[in-house]
Amino acid sequence: MPDRKIGDYVVGAEIGRGSFANVYKGYNSKTQVSVAIKSVIKSRLRNKKLIENLEVEISILKNLKHPHVVALLDCEQSKHYFHLLMEYCSLGDLSYFITKREELISNHPLITGVFKKYPSPENSKGLNEVITINFVQQLASALKFLRSQNLVHRDIKPQNLLLSPPVSREVFEDRKYTGLWELPVLKIADFGFARFLPATSMAETLCGSPLYMAPEILRYEKYNAKADLWSVGAVVYEMSVGTPPFPAHNHVELLRNIERQKDKISFPKVAQVPPEIIQLICGLLKQQATERMSFQEFFNDPVITTKLQPCSDEPLLPQNQHIDENLFISEYLPRNSITDKNINNNITNIAKNGVEEALLEEEDEEEDQDQLPSKNDNIQHMEPDSSMLLNKTTQKQTEVQSQPRRELVSEKDYVVVEKRAVEVNALADELEHAGSGALAMQLTNNVGTPYTRRYSSSSRSSSTGSNQRRPSFGDRKVPISISPTNALSKAINIASNRLFKQPSPPKATPVLLEEKDKDKNTERLTSTVFNQNMLNSTTTREITRPLHSLTITSSTSDEEIIQRLSNLTTKAYAIKLLAEIKFSQLAPLPPSNETAVFDNYGDDEGTQSGYNNEPLSPILIKTIGEEGIALYVKTLFLLSKAMNIAMEWWRLNSLSRPASPKLNDLVQWIRGKFNESLEKAEFIKLKLQNAKEQLEESESDTDKTVVAEKLIFDRAIEISRIAVVNELKNDDLVGTELSYATAIWMLEALLEPDDTEESKLDDEDRKMIEKFISSIGNRLSVLRKKIESTSQETRK
């Protein structure tokens, strides 16, 4: 938190929080005038792109003086913060005004008076048409001014439209406000994405909030200032109806919903939207920017030019009643009705285990009691638990899951642009355009392409990423002996016995992952074969223990950074492959190069296409979905951690030396996999929500706790078991080598420490996992000698 005093300003209570800044209520100690203090945390601005956004916002606001644009009063800087002293808007934002209408009517005297005099249509979530027109006219006034300055805002949404209390008629006219003097005053805020963009110019940066984003931006096409008009149409619709025009959980679904409507916008009868407002909205919400209403047509529309008059002379407040304009709007509500302190803000922290909070649902812990004692005498050092993995881990995970969750999708119909996604893409863009070599430029159309673009396309190419390089991985050594502990040994013995009792896999398969999902009377068996391209770089060097934490300094070499990033990305890639199995079960798509690790995918009998189109039951979707989300969460954590290291290195070195093509290559790879994993996690979450809605409450509430660590451990041990069998049979030794490498990296991922929280694994757990890594590593070394010997004999 910033100091209690910043220059002449005293800092008060926090009233909002965003991805890079916190907002506080404050006042000038000399004039007693209230202000909003936007304190940007310097440590979160880890690359030039984010700093540039702040600089642009400050430079724009310094020169913008308009009654319907939030004013920048002053700027201050301290050791840890940039402070923007802004005009204080005590009625919060438009989103809060709409969604909390009923509670505000009951508790806020001014809002009570506004809705008493201008009531919403019965049973409608929207606003009275006079209030809507008032806000639209004020928004149009601000946009007309921005237009005159060649500015495009690029993030118009209800959360960025702030409200101030109404003023007297005289003050209203003196300040040159637009609209109706006795209604709240709307002002545009948050110019972090704004750019100077002449009418003939085109931009192509993906920014803004998806629910209000123009389709040309969603399609990753170039766009101009008319993209703001689409956002205005979406906002006007939400004011009139109470919900966004195209509810969606992600970019893909949003674009699909927009295209499905074919410019035919539906309005609920209960909303009683006037024809002139319907006509305005339909003119703004045209998919093709060329068909969309122009700015001049918008400014001249009857809704904008209509002169509003009070419906009566009755004042909004009785003469003996006044409101304290220093109180923020949420302070009028009872504390138990404020479900989230950050309800006005676009917040989701996709850093480290914050990803987990964003994606996972609360679940009850239930241990798997399936135990089948057996012994395989051929395998002495690989007897892990496959059903009761890490009891302590499960307990810790359950404790975390019992805490309140922030949805990845805030509320039901609002899509959040995650902080981590912004940071990841910002750094990747910066490195890509920082002159780091021809290879970086070549990757622009390959690795850096966000997954949504491919996924939303009706035609999919199998060569999407054919030019992507795999990360390179340094040599490390496996410790030969790490003594086991009792924490996991019993559970591991039980699981290994159960696993080794299972029949051997088919021949000529390097790695076979068996997914057994039972749905009452049905059992589905999905087999997935990893091909030999998976983690090929890990099989060219000795697989060993991970590096110790790397302290980033200005003298840290590219090679040191690349080695650490490669270590993390290999772990992430191994876990992502497992998550892909779950995703493919819920969304079986033709295989592309992104999922080329899956050579065969089908049911027991198999099909010519390799896919089983039989619909899954809701309970099965729920099981697969929860496991898939948990695995993508782990993937995002590892990729996020890798990007944090790259960000810190770039922050210290960007001014003194460029990133090497190799480092840029790796960062672009991380960006691509991060975006893809996030999109797929959102897709699975949507499927999961739909499945839960179809289930009986009793079915939905009696579930096992899904722990990513258990899933990863189970699969790593199963891969190792199958590899051992194949090795003993002298069957497909190259594939077996790949299997051992895969299992090692999956186990390594479990040992990756979390820098912000207490590790989920205690010392005993870690030592036991290290023992298995050592054991598998030893078998891998022996196998490689055997392969080399065979190769030499073949050459003779």
UniProtKB/Swiss-Prot annotation:
Classify the protein's membrane topology as the record does: Peripheral membrane protein
Bias (Polar residues) ranges: 389-403
Disordered: region residues: 360-382, 389-408, 450-480
* Compositional bias of kind Low complexity: 453-470
- Where located? Cytoplasm; Preautophagosomal structure membrane
Where is composition skewed (Acidic residues) in this entry? Answer: 360-370
Its function, per the record, reads: Serine/threonine protein kinase involved in the cytoplasm to vacuole transport (Cvt) and found to be essential in autophagy, where it is required for the formation of autophagosomes. Involved in the clearance of protein aggregates which cannot be efficiently cleared by the proteasome. Required for selective autophagic degradation of the nucleus (nucleophagy) as well as for mitophagy which contributes to regulate mitochondrial quantity and quality by eliminating the mitochondria to a basal level to fulfill cellular energy requirements and preventing excess ROS production.
Q: Which family does it belong to?
A: Belongs to the protein kinase superfamily. Ser/Thr protein kinase family. APG1/unc-51/ULK1 subfamily.
What's the protein called, per UniProt? Serine/threonine-protein kinase ATG1
Q: Which organism is it from?
A: Komagataella pastoris
